[in-house]
């Protein structure tokens, strides 16, 4: 394994609160503190702080985000900060996933249906192989990193290691490649190899642009070259190369034979059990399905849904902890949990949701009981895998605060921007008061966000504001991705002055033009009016120098009090720092990116409005889908995963409408 060092490349030095936050976190890690929390206010440069920490402690790092979009953003940022190190991306490789399920009430079996994204599968292989080759590795993952993977020992042992001068029969190499689930195929794809006389060309599972050309002289490897898969151009000579398995669920032949025996034994026991309960249909179904899978495993070495037999393949006892990405890391690794107030509850909930669905399949003869052991980690198992962990959030939850000896604060923004001022006003006459405030913002060419508690109120308020002559849009959960991006962009361009919504905490709403956030029914305790939600909502006005928040309420709840006091405390710290250093807060300047060039542009609104998707012919729609798919692939290649994900959602919508 290469002992690489992290090299942070950035055009600026840590500023404001960042140097002290970095020093405290690094000191904690060096002293062996297990849990630490970074309380970083919105827009204080938390990613840059964490990058500095990673560079200084020099440990393999796993960064966990709560969805693919955020993971994509973090991956792009970290790749820019660490261009000379291995920054990898590990998220669920399904573009679309319908898990296997059974609905007993209607006797409906839903087969597993999935569309695997080849690009993401490649990146997953690249991530696991990097962990075996070097130490300067950062893997950005979604919560899917706690789902079961194959055994890391098995994965490591089955690596095919080739050196110049090594004695190995050509056919023996081909057999070893087939053992690790490579296919022989003359058309070049990841996870395949092709043979031309004494030359074997291998296309590793972790990349599709390069292939490894192994040249034999008799039974000896004469030379190894890295070749451009497309042009055939030689990119370099290699003395040694390691070919990693094409699947994370690989097993040696003798282990597979043992696993098949154990599966057969479990099948016999389960069939006897079902028949004794008079469940003859379930028994017949289970026998038919399992025998087919066993036949495939004997003949091909794998079967569809092989992960359901992962406990047997790894020869693990019932109920034991499954292997996950965390087991591929060395023991001294570091975990960073981004937006921990959302990510930790997600990690906690994964096991129960998965278990409930699989239990129904087992009860009705679709799967053996051992399938229950192909599962995500429980939260307790996740805790046991932690070596050292840093939770990052603007509003850490009770778990993080309880487990961290002290919270490291990062309150000051490099831009000098302050947390917004807050007013609490009575609900009587609130709408007329709000209209007056909105008009003030319109005159200054600033925007307003209004959050309500119910859908009905949001709709009524939108209609009322429209009647009052205000340019307003309503953002709700049923709005499709394409429209959502378009509405946010139009708000920034000034087509709308106000955005009304229920949940303003979703990503994509950090808009520098917003100087006023109005919170209606602020005194109604609940999920969207808890102290954490209120602080996050207040943060939506923190990117503008005139940021202000109005809470309409008749009483001040405990959550409101905590949120107001916390915001005031942060603002006082920020003001003091600005005064000391002579900093004048300036609104963030953020370019208005044209997210989907092919579908609309502000400059050509007439053309776009003339052809909404519903009015397109089948041919025009197909042409648009082709263009968008090409753009999506380009965006993925350029590592702009946020844009690629948005384009993917739009393509789904267009296909659904067609």
From Swiss-Prot:
One of its GO terms (biological process) is nucleotide-excision repair. Residues 622-657 form the UVR domain. A motif (Beta-hairpin) lies at residues 93-116. Residues 27-414 form the Helicase ATP-binding domain. Keywords: ATP-binding, Cytoplasm, DNA damage, DNA excision, DNA repair, Excision nuclease, Nucleotide-binding, SOS response. It is found in: Cytoplasm. Residues 430-596 form the Helicase C-terminal domain. It comes from the Bacteria. GO terms for cellular component: cytoplasm; excinuclease repair complex. ATP binds at residues 40-47. Binds 1 Mg(2+) ion per subunit. Signal peptide: none annotated. One of its GO terms (molecular function) is excinuclease ABC activity. Its cofactor is Mg(2+). Forms a heterotetramer with UvrA during the search for lesions. Interacts with UvrC in an incision complex. Belongs to the UvrB family. The beta-hairpin motif is involved in DNA binding. The UvrABC repair system catalyzes the recognition and processing of DNA lesions. A damage recognition complex composed of 2 UvrA and 2 UvrB subunits scans DNA for abnormalities. Upon binding of the UvrA(2)B(2) complex to a putative damaged site, the DNA wraps around one UvrB monomer. DNA wrap is dependent on ATP binding by UvrB and probably causes local melting of the DNA helix, facilitating insertion of UvrB beta-hairpin between the DNA strands. Then UvrB probes one DNA strand for the presence of a lesion. This is UvrABC system protein B.
């Amino acid at each position: 394994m290469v002992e690489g060092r992290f090299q942070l490349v950035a055009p600026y030095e840590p500023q404001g609160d960042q140097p002290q936050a970095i020093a405290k976190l690094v000191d904690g890690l060096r002293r062996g503190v297990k849990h630490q929390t970074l309380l970083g206010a919105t827009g204080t440069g938390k990613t840059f702080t964490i990058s500095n920490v990673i560079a200084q402690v020099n440990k393999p790092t796993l960064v966990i985000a709560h969805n693919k979009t955020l993971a994509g953003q973090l991956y792009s940022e970290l790749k820019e900060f660490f261009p000379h190190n291995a920054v990898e991306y590990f998220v669920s490789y399904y573009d679309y996933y319908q898990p296997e399920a059974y609905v007993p009430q209607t006797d409906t079996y839903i087969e597993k249906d999935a569309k695997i994204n080849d690009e993401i599968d490649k990146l997953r292989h690249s991530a696991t192989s990097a962990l075996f080759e070097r130490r300067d590795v950062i893997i950005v993952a979604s919560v899917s990193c706690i789902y079961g993977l194959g055994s890391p020992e098995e994965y490591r042992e089955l690596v095919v290691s080739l050196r110049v001068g090594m004695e190995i029969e050509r056919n023996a190499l081909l057999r070893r490649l087939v053992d690790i689930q490579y296919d022989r195929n003359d058309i070049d794809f990841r996870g395949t190899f092709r043979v031309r006389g004494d030359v074997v060309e291998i296309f590793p599972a972790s990349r599709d642009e390069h292939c490894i050309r192994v040249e034999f002289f008799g039974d000896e490897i004469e030379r190894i070259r890295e070749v451009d898969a497309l042009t055939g151009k030689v990119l370099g000579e290699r003395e040694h190369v390691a070919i990693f398995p094409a699947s994370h669920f690989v097993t040696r032949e003798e282990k597979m034979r043992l696993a098949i025996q154990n599966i057969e034994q479990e099948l016999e026991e389960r069939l006897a059990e079902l028949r004794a309960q008079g469940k003859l249909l379930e028994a017949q179904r289970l026998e038919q399905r399992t025998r087919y899978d066993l036949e495939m495993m004997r003949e091909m070495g794998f079967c569809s849904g092989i992960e359901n037999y992962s406990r047997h393949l790894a020869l693990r006892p019932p109920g034991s902890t499954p292997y996950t990405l965390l087991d591929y890391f060395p023991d001294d690794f570091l975990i960073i949990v981004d937006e921990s107030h959302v990510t930790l509850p997600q990690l906690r909930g994964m096991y129960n949701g998965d278990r409930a669905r699989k239990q129904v399949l087992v009860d009705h003869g679709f799967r053996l009981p051992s399938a229950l052991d192909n599962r995500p980690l429980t939260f307790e198992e996740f805790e046991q895998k932690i070596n050292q962990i840093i939770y990052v959030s603007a509003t850490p939850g009770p778990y993080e605060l309880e487990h961290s000896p002290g919270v490291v604060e990062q309150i000051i923004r490099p831009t000098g921007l302050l947390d917004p001022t807050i007013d609490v006003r009575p609900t009587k006459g609130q709408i007329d008061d709000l209209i007056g405030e909105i008009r003030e913002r319109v005159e200054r060419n600033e925007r307003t966000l209004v959050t309500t508690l119910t859908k009905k109120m949001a709709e009524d308020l939108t209609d009322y504001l429209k009647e009052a002559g205000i340019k307003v849009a309503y953002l709700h959960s049923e709005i499709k991705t394409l429209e959502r991006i378009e509405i946010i962009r139009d708000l920034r361009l000034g087509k709308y002055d106000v955005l009304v919504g229920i949940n303003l905490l979703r990503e994509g709403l950090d808009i520098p033009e917003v100087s006023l956030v109005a919170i209606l029914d602020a005194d109604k305790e609940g999920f969207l009016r808890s102290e954490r939600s209120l602080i996050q909502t207040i943060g939506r006005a923190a990117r503008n120098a005139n940021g202000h928040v109005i809470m309409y309420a008749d009483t001040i709840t405990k959550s409101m009090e905590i949120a107001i006091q916390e915001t005031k405390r942060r603002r006082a710290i920020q003001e003091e720092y600005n005064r000391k250093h002579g900093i004048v807060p300036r609104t963030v300047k953020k370019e208005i990116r044209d997210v989907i060039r092919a579908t609309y542009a502000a400059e050509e609104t007439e053309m776009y409005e003339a052809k909404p998707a519903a009015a397109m012919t089948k041919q025009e729609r197909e042409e648009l889908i082709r263009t968008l798919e090409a753009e999506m692939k380009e965006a993925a290649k350029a590592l702009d995963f946020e844009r690629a994900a948005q384009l993917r959602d739009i393509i789904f919508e267009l296909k659904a409408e067609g």
